[in-house]
Amino acid sequence: MCKAVIMAGGEGKRLRPITCTLPKPMVPLLNKPVIDYCIELLKKHGVEDITATLHYLPNVIMRHCGDGGKYGVKLSYSIEDAPLGTAGSVRKAVGADARRTIVISGDAMTDADLTEAMCFHKARGAAVTIVLKRVSVPTEYGVAMTDSKGRIYRFLEKPMLSEVFSDLANTGIYILEPEVIERIPEGEKYDFSKDLFPALLKEKMPVYGYVTDRYWCDIGDIAQYKAAQRDMLDGRCAFTTAAKQKDGAWIEDGAVISESAELLGPCYIGSGAEVSEAVVSDYSVVGSGARIGRGSSLKRTVLMENTRVRENAELRGAILCEGAEVESGASIYSGTVIGSGSRVGKNCTVCNGASLWPEKELREDEDCTENLQWEEDTPKPGIMSRIRGYCDRTMTPERAVRIGAAFARSSGRLPLEIAVSTDGSQQGV
């Protein structure tokens, strides 16, 4: 049996403000984090010993995934204090384990046939097999050229348009023999595409490319994030879901939907969501615990967990992150992301492409035409101010300790003991 490493340390800067409070592998697709689909895919193909490499907001992933028991796998973690690169992080995660290793990116959606890829790897006697996918725009990925037997003889990471020599893109799924992993320097920043693969090709090592015809989408930016969910609702990707399909709408148990609501599929409604006399249509996704008020209309919109859309609001191509609120009469248009815990006031308009970073607020009747970010009005808390955020995200243990230390210093009487406590809820004020 082989083991697997999920590369899950990505920060996902191009997905901000979604990833301001979520690590990239925790971004939800149809109400379930991307990393869940990765673990389920590995389990499906018989790989049950998994290590996830973590760096950005690691506690969010560990709290959600636990020890892997809920997936039927054994899941451990390798946390990087400083980024080690793709290969360096895998080297740290594998350690002295001498088994063949499957590496998979924790921020891509795929139903690739890993069993078939493994058979290909063994039959070729490969030191490394890279799973490849034909794409129309290869400049965003590493590209490879293979001979008739699949052996890679040319590889280039993210070529310029003038440098493109192939449409075979690197999916970030690798099968590695132990001797290859041993070549990766320990404790150093080292990359598969920029360092390891070029070195192996230079030495004429047997590096092969398995071309998959299954679905694969890198969740690299907002457009790809939306596209992946459209593709899933269109049936282009095989995946497991708790929802049942009815008249084009996917509905999880526990959703509360008014008899007067219009669900014009394809769309997805998560457990515990409440939909009043509203319209949800055109690939919209409503996460668990989200609530939609009477007279509101959603098209091509994603509501993450515990969001609130009040009466007569209009959302077109928007994304609401966890805990965001939209008041009555507000209008939010295409390309907009409302960050975690943010609030769009009554009768406000958020124009195309403008976004609110977490914990921002638009007051009644305001228009937003550009991004409202943290830097624009950094809060300066006074004695009566409050600090608000999600545990392990904006409210990390380190930040809580710094807050306690700041209170102690400001008292003017040292030594002084300050207690930092929690009531166990996810959101703290």
Task: Set out the residue ranges of the language-model regions.
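Short acidic/polar active-site loop segments enriched in Thr and Asp
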Residues: 2, 48, 99, 127, ...
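N-terminal glycine-rich phosphate-binding loop and ensuing alpha1 helix
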Residues: 2-62
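Conserved beta-loop-beta/alpha segment of the NTase-like Rossmann-fold superfamily
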Residues: 62-148, 183-185
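Catalytic-core segments of class I nucleotidyltransferases/pyrophosphorylases
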Residues: 101-102, 109, 115-122, 135-138, ...
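Extended, small-residue-rich solenoid/repeat segments and analogous flexible loops
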Residues: 188, 201-297
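Glycine-rich hexapeptide-repeat left-handed beta-helix
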Residues: 279, 294-387, 391-392
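An N-terminal, well-structured beta->alpha segment
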Residues: 377-427
